[in-house]
Amino acid sequence: TMLQVAAQELGVHPSKISVSVGDTDSVGHTEVSGGSRITYTMSNAVNQACTRMLGLLRERAAAELEVDPQELEYDTGIFSSRVSQDKRLTLTDLGRQSLRRGGPVTATGAVARMQPAPAFSAHVVDVEVDMETGQVKLLNYTAFQDVGRAVNPTQVEGQIQGGAVQGIGWALMEGYQFSESGVLQNANLLDYKTPTATDVPFIDTVILEIPASDGPYGIRGVGETPIIPPLPALANAIHNATGVRIRELPMNPEALFHAMQGRGG
């Protein structure tokens, strides 16, 4: 996603951008890389760095072409003079000339704490409940989410689907079990159940784009929001199917069976 932001700001094809994974020890103190804040905040920093980079490149291009920097316009990786059309330089040209023009051009971007950009989501689910065993089967699942702007729609769709599956796990399966003496009884993934591909249907996603007021492109965080709606959506669907309202998690077959027995159904 950051690669796409840089390519957009620099006006070049994404294949021209390479991303190096840095060591966080080499940068200043910041908050954690989480909380659905990465795309929202980091894209702002990338945007700043690219803007500064183009400013420095404009000055070098102007010196090389012997024109005023304000005379140059930039488009798709090319600086050209508004006055003399034959005066033009590509980013490739500037790169080749960098050693005799002061070395490689570097620019940085940084953001302080930004105003929150809340994300909104609604999930719709159809379930089938076995009234004898309490087993819940998901038939259809659709997730709607306002993402501000989907810079990389494929990744956004994957995040929404992954978050929904995590929420489904919390709602129907996942929960620690302790003995009377406080010993954890399901400390491995054999006993601690999580959803697999056989437990969930294909999750349809509907991406809504209502830009946030802060940050480039109106981006909003995506990753955490889809985790929450599955819990009330499934609780409501189960209630609609059985008449039983479950108020504790997980809503597994045992819990649902006992709830239906307690209701007398």
Predicted segments, located by residue:
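C-terminal catalytic domains of large/alpha subunits in multi-subunit enzymes
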Residues: Q4-G265
